[in-house]
Structures are given as structure tokens and as C-alpha cells.
A protein has these predicted regions:
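Aromatic-rich, lipid-facing transmembrane alpha helices and their immediate juxtamembrane interface loops
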Residues: 1-291
Length: 291
């Protein structure tokens, strides 16, 4: 199967070279459209695991029988594990990306245990594979964010300018993680954290390669865009009753847009955890310029 995938990849590259040659003869606009197409393809490929998880939630919400011997949540958990095995066996996911998923699964589940215990949200379905009130599939939902960042880093061959020291970003991520717990006890310093995020990552640019040339964008803008898409995904998750907020018990409504800020902070934690695995890939100047 791996050999077949490699052959298909080589064949597609040949087709793309011919398309690129035609696009270059058509002028700047056709080149832009061709590159935009490839940007979308790479983004979709980076979202592979997260997209499959969302598809699972939608499909089981629509078609899973209420009297099935295996609960919906348990099916999603077992299928997520099977997806990971297939992705690793076929080479569609690297061991480093799998390590990211395991790491996120642990940290995400720990936070879920606290949040469900304090009533922040609930999981209305029954399950056998759970810890406390948290079905094990939830760790994979957090892991899909880390998987996306790790895959995007590899696919777009990220480079950075103006990047803060990794040790400083780690301290910021630890403070954010602590605040997710502390805010339930009346200690909420998220606005100070937002200021820290802007100060630390505001000057940073991420350089990414779609095809041959590198493009760049502010890293903070990238964080915000991903946080927005996570918010869209969360609305899908609550709509399919995979989990619910207290205000959604009687009838579903969209998750408040203010939650985008929480997802932005979660993005910082996710990015720092992934960048720990890619720390050697950060340029020496970027690792030591700031602070």
C-alpha cells in the first residue's frame, strides 16, 4: 500500500508540473489561482485527522442506532484509534505526529476531567471507555489540533523570523493552562495573557512554502484564523450532541463568539507543545533574539 501511495504521489506531481507550466503562461492571475488551489489542498491534508474526527461525530449523530450494543462514544474512540493505526502503517502520519497526538490526549483529558467536574460542559451519552465523566474520544479532539499544527509545519516547511525564545513561550503556555483551572476559583487573568500573547508573538512572521516560493504571514494572525475554525468545529460538535454546554440543554444554539478567545489561548498551548518537538528546526537567531 505504501508503494502504491508513493507511485500515486509521483504521478500527481507530474500532472501538477504540467498544470504549473500552463498556469505560468496564463499570467499572474492563473499562477495565483494554481497556488491558492495547492494552499487549500495542503490545508485539507493537514486537517486530515481533525476532519475525520468531525466526520465521525456527524455520521454517528445521523446514523448511529440508539439501541446499538456499542455506545456512540465508544465507537468513536475505537475508530479514532484505528485511524491512527492506519495513518501510521501507511506512512500518512509520522511518528513525531503520533507522539503529538498522545501528548495532547493526556493534557486534554486532564483538563476535561476538571471542566466536566465543575459543570462547564457535559457529555450526554453513555460510554464504557471513559475516565470519570469524560469519554476517551475527547482526548482525540484536542489531539486533532496538535496533529494539524504538526502536519502543517511539515507540509508547509515553516520558517520563522522574530520568533520569541522557546522557554518564554513555554512559560506563557503554562500560565494559560493554569488559568483554565484558576478561573473557576475567581482568579482569571486571561486579559493579561492576551497582552502577553500579543507582545510575544506580535512581531513574529511565519514563512511557509505552498509550491516553490515562500510566502509569509503574521504568526498571530495564523493563530486567530485557526482559533476561528476550531470555534466552527465546536459548533458542529455541540450541534451533533457530542457534548453540550449548560445553556444548550433545552435547545441548541451557537457557541458564543467569546469562546474564540479561549480557543486562541488553547492554540498557544498547542503551538508551544508542537514547537517543542520541532525546537531544533527553529533558527538559532530566532531562538535567542527576543527577551
Amino acid at each position: 500500500m505504501i508503494a502504491a501511495l508513493r507511485a500515486a504521489r509521483l504521478g500527481w506531481h507530474g500532472i501538477d508540473r504540467r498544470i504549473a507550466a500552463r498556469a505560468s503562461r496564463g499570467g499572474r492571475f492563473t499562477v495565483f489561482v494554481h497556488e491558492l488551489f495547492w494552499f487549500g489542498v495542503k490545508q485539507a491534508w493537514a486537517c486530515l485527522f481533525g476532519g475525520l474526527m468531525l466526520a465521525l461525530l456527524i455520521a454517528t449523530w445521523m446514523f448511529w442506532p440508539a439501541n446499538a450494543p456499542l455506545g456512540r462514544y465508544d465507537f468513536v474512540t475505537l475508530t479514532a484509534i484505528a485511524i491512527q493505526v492506519v495513518l501510521l502503517a501507511t506512512g500518512l502520519e509520522t511518528r513525531r505526529e503520533a507522539a503529538v497526538i498522545v501528548l495532547f490526549h493526556v493534557t486534554g483529558t486532564l483538563m476535561e476531567l476538571f471542566k466536566t467536574a465543575t459543570g462547564s460542559w457535559i457529555y450526554p451519552g453513555a460510554s464504557i471507555l471513559h475516565v470519570g465523566g469524560v469519554p476517551l474520544f475527547t482526548g482525540f479532539m484536542y489531539a486533532s489540533v496538535g496533529s494539524y499544527i504538526a502536519r502543517a509545519w511539515r507540509l508547509f516547511e515553516f520558517r520563522f523570523t522574530g520568533h520569541p525564545r522557546w522557554s518564554h513561550t513555554a512559560l506563557l503556555a503554562a500560565a494559560i493552562y493554569l488559568n483554565f483551572f484558576a478561573d473557576h476559583y475567581g482568579i482569571d487573568f486571561r486579559w493579561l495573557l492576551f497582552v502577553g500573547v500579543a507582545w510575544m508573538f506580535g512581531p513574529c512572521w511565519v514563512h511557509y512554502r505552498v509550491r516553490r516560493r515562500y510566502r509569509r504571514m503574521p504568526l498571530l494572525l495564523g493563530f486567530m484564523l485557526v482559533a476561528l475554525f476550531i470555534w466552527f468545529a465546536e459548533n458542529l460538535g455541540t450541534f451533533t450532541r457530542a457534548w453540550m454546554y449548560p445553556a444548550q440543554h433545552r435547545a441548541w444554539h451557537m457557541v458564543p463568539p467569546e469562546k474564540i478567545g479561549s480557543w486562541l489561548l488553547l492554540m498557544i498551548i498547542s503551538y508551544v507543545m508542537v514547537s517543542a518537538l520541532y525546537r531544533r528546526a527553529l533558527p538559532d537567531a530566532a531562538a535567542g533574539q527576543r527577551g
